[in-house]
Amino acid sequence: NSEYYSEKVGTLNVVNSNPTFSNFTYEDTNATTIKLTGGNQAIVKGYSNVKAIVSVANKAIAKNYASISKYRLVIGSKQLDINYSSDASVSGTINKVESNIFNMYAIDSRGNSTVKQISPNRYLDYSDIIIKQASVQRTGGVGSEVTLAFSGTYWGYGFGAMNNAITSCYYEYKTTTSDSWIKGGDLSVSLDGNNISFKGTIKGDIGANGFDIQKSFNIRVIVKDRLSQSIYTMTLGSGTPAIAITKKGISVNGMYKESLGGALQIWNGDVYIDGKKINFS
């Protein structure tokens, strides 16, 4: 009897070998957002921490003699690998999620995968409060009276258990040479839809009279809602005028002091007439 042998070279493709995987659950674990929404199923963009859970009942099952190696949770641009277990629930958490699409991949030892996609019951497209523009000005460009103005936006909607709100707004100041901030006072913000604004005179280092004209200051506004805050810092220059003209007289290099009187007051400088220094002492 004769025997015949034939050799074939090729690639064997195993089909229908992706793991069986059909479900997982999630919950928010951020205590702050849970309090705002009233539960752990609503997700707040940028603040909720999403914990994804694969229970034993929902575990992935490999096919054709492969084994499950891991799960991979993907939310937006963030991802996390989670160890597989056949006899215990497994979970992983992605913090501060910015997408309402949660993808969980079950990956086997051959690299085959099956994805399950879910979305939260409620996804709140929250945006941080922000001061877009602000200014501080001395009245007339000189003097101690200072006006502060700013405008911005906030997320003016409800979370579920409570509505968003401006929780505080105040300003602080310091001289430009100092490192220590001083709280100036609270500010009453005007609301118009999602827009916020303020304009008014503010107290300073000389109380209700404002800010010392001989000094320059840093002034910053801090506004907060239930989740975020915005800080805007400005510089206030000194308020000493080169020339101050009043009904009672003229002052050079300073404000005219009515208590002193006189037609001409000169501060912090020498006086020259025809190139000659005048000595008043």
Say what each PLM segment does.
Residues K78-A88, G185-T201:
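Short beta-strand segments within Ig-like beta-sandwich modules, predominantly Fibronectin type-III
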Residues K45-Y47, N83-S85, N95-V97, L124, ...:
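Surface-exposed coil/turn segments at beta-strand junctions on protein surfaces, enriched
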Residues E3-V14, I82, N112-R122, S228-A242:
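Edge beta-strands of extracellular beta-sandwich domains
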Residues A106-D108, V221-D225:
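Conserved structural position at the C-terminal beta-strand
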Residues V15-K45, Y123-T147:
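Short, compositionally biased P/S/T/A/G/V-rich stretches that sit at domain boundaries
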Residues K247-S281:
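Intrinsic low-complexity, repeat-rich intrinsically disordered segments enriched
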Residues V90-N100, F198-F217:
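Surface-exposed, short loops/turns at beta-strand junctions within beta-sandwich domains
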Residues A42-V74, T153-K183:
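Solvent-exposed loop/turn segments flanking beta-strands in beta-repeat/beta-sandwich domains
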